[in-house]
């Protein structure tokens, strides 16, 4: 039936205890299906025809410690006298006779325990229910799901927070009953006294909460020290001083509006810009490290950013004005006047994208000064002898502004980002204003003062 296997089955010399041969070894099919030992090592095993009548029962237990996938086959007729011949291609591993005797001595109806090292078939899909594993997944106080070990005990977030609040606020509770209230998942909030006592009984440590608080305080102090030392080169106090030093006096602001002026809005804006250009140089000199740059680089930076610096200044000054802007000269320019003069489009952008936003977030003068310093330290300005130094100064202003907003407005974590979002709008509006001024200079029907004219005659220094 199976023929001779000598042409394809080869085993090492002495394999399975058989005599050594110099060439290949011819084996019978029954020997090939064994574990490698010759069948004569099991004298009780003989070839049995498949058709022999026999009542069989399958016991759902792995056969040996190797984890065979086949079930033990036993007979109601007593111990087996042989093995069933398996179909070709299936290897039935014959167990040692000692294990087979143990299995056969057990009643078929009895629950057979798995051999050491193997999981039982009946409980393979069930999670571990050992006491140690349950402790890690259940809150020791109320029995809810544990989120980890807190203050020395596995507990849920609710009991962890309750214990921490009790210790930090030094709370004192009283029990309305006999101080033996049931504390479980459903009733843990009914009696705070008994809940706290159970926390202590189960092993929660008061000192663990106090140590955690001390570590948090030390970490906050360390971060504050690092922040202050990192911003010593660009203190926000000096930036604020620069803003206040060049701020127009309040008494110079009158109730004048466009009806009190004989000039058109564009002329008034140009006069105010020329006046502010003189104070702009003084402001820049007060910004930390600006004067440390070469004189040539100082001039380049001022020429590159003067328009944005002035627009930011009068926009912030105008947050208290209704539907208009307040110039440094004290004049109010109303929206309707700007539209009649042909500059309504850019005027509307100033009110919408700058003045309104500054008003909504209540931008203070320190934040305004930092934004203007960021504009001033522009490493992209053409012709700089040391752009990397300018970029370093800008980054220091970034860090100063971020630290200031975190300390002054801790309830507004996104404030720093909102401030920086005003810079693209400021750049875009500044470029548009330059286009208008160049146009007015070209047609020559608007008087432009000396300093402003000098700025306009210089090629634009922004990439």
From Swiss-Prot:
Keywords: Cytoplasm, DNA-binding, Metal-binding, Nucleus, Receptor, Transcription, Transcription regulation, Zinc, Zinc-finger. Residues 211-222 have a biased composition (Basic and acidic residues). Acetylated by EP300. The keyword Metal-binding applies. Residues 231-459 form the NR LBD domain. It is found in: Nucleus; Cytoplasm. One of its GO terms (molecular function) is retinoic acid-responsive element binding. Residues 17-53, 211-232 are annotated as: Disordered. GO terms for cellular component: cytoplasm; RNA polymerase II transcription regulator complex. Pfam families: Hormone_recep, Nuc_recep-AF1, zf-C4. Belongs to the nuclear hormone receptor family. NR2 subfamily. Composed of three domains: a modulating N-terminal domain, a DNA-binding domain and a C-terminal ligand-binding domain. Homodimer. Heterodimer with a RAR molecule. Binds DNA preferentially as a RAR/RXR heterodimer. Interacts with RARA. This is Retinoic acid receptor RXR-gamma.
């Amino acid at each position: 039936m199976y023929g001779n296997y000598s042409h394809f089955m080869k085993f090492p010399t002495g394999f399975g205890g058989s005599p050594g041969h110099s060439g290949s070894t011819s084996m019978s099919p029954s020997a090939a299906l064994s574990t490698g030992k010759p069948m004569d090592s099991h004298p009780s095993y003989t070839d049995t025809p498949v058709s022999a009548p026999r009542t069989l029962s399958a016991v759902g237990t792995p056969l040996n410690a190797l984890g065979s996938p086949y079930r033990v086959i036993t007979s109601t007729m007593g111990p087996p006298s042989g093995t069933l011949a398996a179909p070709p291609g299936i290897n039935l591993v014959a167990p040692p006779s000692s294990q087979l005797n143990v299995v056969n001595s057990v009643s078929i109806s009895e629950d057979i325990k798995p051999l050491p090292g193997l999981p039982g078939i009946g409980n393979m899909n069930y999670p571990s229910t050992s006491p140690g594993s349950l402790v890690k997944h259940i809150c020791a106080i109320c029995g809810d799901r544990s989120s980890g070990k807190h203050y020395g005990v596995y507990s849920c977030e609710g009991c962890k927070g309750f214990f921490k609040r009790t210790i930090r606020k030094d709370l004192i509770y009283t029990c309305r009953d006999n101080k033996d209230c049931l504390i479980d998942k459903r009733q843990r909030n009914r009696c705070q006294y008994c809940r706290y006592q159970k926390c202590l009984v189960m092993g929660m440590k008061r000192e663990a909460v106090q140590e955690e608080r001390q570590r948090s305080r030390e970490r906050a102090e360390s971060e504050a020290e690092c922040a202050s030392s990192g911003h010593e080169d660009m203190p926000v106090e000096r930036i604020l001083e620069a803003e206040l030093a060049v701020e127009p006096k309040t008494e110079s602001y009158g109730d004048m509006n466009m009806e009190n002026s004989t000039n058109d809005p564009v002329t008034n804006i140009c006069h105010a810009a020329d006046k502010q250009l003189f104070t702009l140089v003084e402001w820049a000199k007060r910004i930390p490290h600006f004067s440390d740059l070469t004189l040539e680089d100082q001039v380049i930076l001022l020429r590159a950013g003067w328009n944005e610096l002035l627009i930011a200044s009068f926009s912030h000054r105008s947050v208290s004005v209704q539907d208009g802007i307040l110039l440094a000269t004290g004049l109010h320019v109303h929206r309707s006047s700007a539209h009649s003069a042909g500059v309504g489009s850019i005027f509307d952008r100033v009110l919408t994208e700058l003045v309104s936003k500054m008003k909504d977030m209540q931008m203070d003068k320190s934040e305004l000064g930092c934004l203007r310093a960021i504009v001033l330290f522009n490493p992209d300005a053409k012709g700089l002898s040391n752009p990397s130094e300018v970029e370093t100064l800008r980054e220091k202003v970034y860090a100063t502004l971020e630290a200031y907003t975190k300390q002054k407005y801790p309830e507004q974590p996104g404030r720093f980002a909102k401030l920086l979002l005003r810079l693209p709008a400021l750049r875009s509006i500044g470029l548009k204003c330059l286009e208008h001024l160049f146009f007015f200079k070209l047609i020559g029907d608007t008087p432009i003062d000396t300093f402003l004219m000098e700025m306009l005659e210089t090629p634009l220094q922004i990439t």
